[in-house]
Swiss-Prot record:
Transmembrane segments: none annotated. It comes from the Bacteria. Gene3D superfamilies: Ribosomal protein L25, beta domain, Ribosomal Protein L25, Chain P. Coiled coil: none annotated. One of its GO terms (cellular component) is cytosolic large ribosomal subunit. GO terms for biological process: translation. CDD domains: Ribosomal_L25_TL5_CTC. Keywords: Ribonucleoprotein, Ribosomal protein, RNA-binding, rRNA-binding. SUPFAM superfamilies: Ribosomal protein L25-like (SSF50715). Part of the 50S ribosomal subunit; part of the 5S rRNA/L5/L18/L25 subcomplex. Contacts the 5S rRNA. Binds to the 5S rRNA independently of L5 and L18. This is Large ribosomal subunit protein bL25. NCBIfam families: bL25_bact_ctc, PRK05618.1-2, PRK05943.1. InterPro entries: Rbsml_bL25/Gln-tRNA_synth_N, Ribosomal_bL25/Gln-tRNA_synth, Ribosomal_bL25_b-dom, Ribosomal_bL25_C, Ribosomal_bL25_long, Ribosomal_bL25_short, Ribosomal_L25_dom, Ribosomal_uL5_bac-type.
Amino acid sequence: MSEILELEAESRTEFGTGAARALRRAGRVPAIIYGAGKTPVSISLEEKEITKYYRKPAFISQLINLTIDKKKYKVLPKAVELHPVTDIVRHVDFVFLEEKTQKMEVPVVYEGKERALGVKRGGYFNIVKRRVTLLCDVNNIPRNVTIDVTNMPMATSLKSSKIELPKGCSFVTNKEFVLATIIGRRGAKTEAEGEQQAAEAGK
């Protein structure tokens, strides 16, 4: 489970382009929270603080305790708008956490891909899925899904049915899919390559 980030925000009562510009001039970022059947809440965040946390790994799957006017809400980042030149955060969408489970997208970390057996024998480790969508218990939301692929041989594919997910998590789909393949040497078409092509065609 990822650590819970504590953030403070202020309610926002003025809207529109002019109000957003005024907030940014004051060093704050407009944001909104919605979802879970609740009334959307418009807020603002301290620009330097939210930009600092955004630049850390896996922010988009970070569980946050957001304090607004002395009330705490459990939320997840949904979308982040950046300045096109400076990469400073300009707007954030958050979603309220569901009471029991939450659908979310998390990054996949392939540990040992440079040392995989198939790579050592001349194969190429090809990533088909960099992120996966999970259904998670709100008390066990992972920052990522980490998979050890050091023993993955040449001409094989890594399928969802073989992945051990963090406790309280499951894939949103029961249909098996390919996450990665080790492609053989050029000119030797493999079963894994065929599965990779089928997976890409089904995207």
